[in-house]
Amino acid sequence: MMLTVDSVAGGYGDIQVLWGVSASVEAGHVTVILGRNGAGKTSLLNAVAGFLPTVRSGQVRLGDLELGRLTPFERVRAGLAYVQEGKRVFHRRTVEENLLLGGYTVKRPFLRRGQRLQTALDRAYERFPILADRRKMVAGRLSGGQQQMLAIAQALIPEPTVVMLDEPSAGLAPAIAKEVFAMVEGLKREGLAVLLVEQVVDNALAIADDVIVIEAGRVAASGPVSDFDDTAMVRDLYLGRGSAGLRQAPDPSDR
């Protein structure tokens, strides 16, 4: 299943933060979105998920399905998962209760079939063995890295085809962050499409197939990860000092 974002423009009320942004990711691939803080990376994910208050133009498609008129709940049902920044779990609920809550975002036939839900739980514990060991522990007692794993595992319970991750390594120790990136690479091997916003450039590029650089709400550059193997060049892109040798996105005003 391919996720396609085509020339999306929008923002928060009268404040426009995205200016004709396009992106895509296909099954079994990771597209990494890079950019400075405030560049519009999270706003792009919010637009895809249905959380951006104002979308003035453009389209978001999941396969052949146009998502523009769907609610965030309906987008999850369609196969989209979104793990927001900040280890968003229910701290007073157990690990297993958190995972079961992930099942309430899917169609009721799924919930009535206990075996399917149990299969989803088993898969979550297979992906994250540490969660299986702590299934009866309240989430608030988990480490930061374990809470992030739980947030990702919960998003995967409905068996999505596309997963969006907003800075999953934020606030994690380097060793734990590597575990999270290894998990993302595992999702790629399973055939999921992954749209990843990250600040840890080296780790992100190591698992990426394609890269998009956003600057001031516009795509500054995009291309296969092989175009971004020059660390100095990537640093310059972060600082907004150019993108020589990379494919430039067309300016929407030129259309």
Where are these regions (language model features)?
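The feature captures the beta-strand-to-loop junction immediately N-terminal to the Walker
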Residues: 34-36
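Conserved ABC transporter NBD signature motif
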Residues: 57-65, 78, 112, 116-121
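ABC ATPase C-loop
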Residues: 155-156
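Conserved catalytic motifs of ABC-family nucleotide-binding domains
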Residues: 159
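Catalytic Walker B motif of ABC-type/P-loop ATPase nucleotide-binding domains
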Residues: 163-167
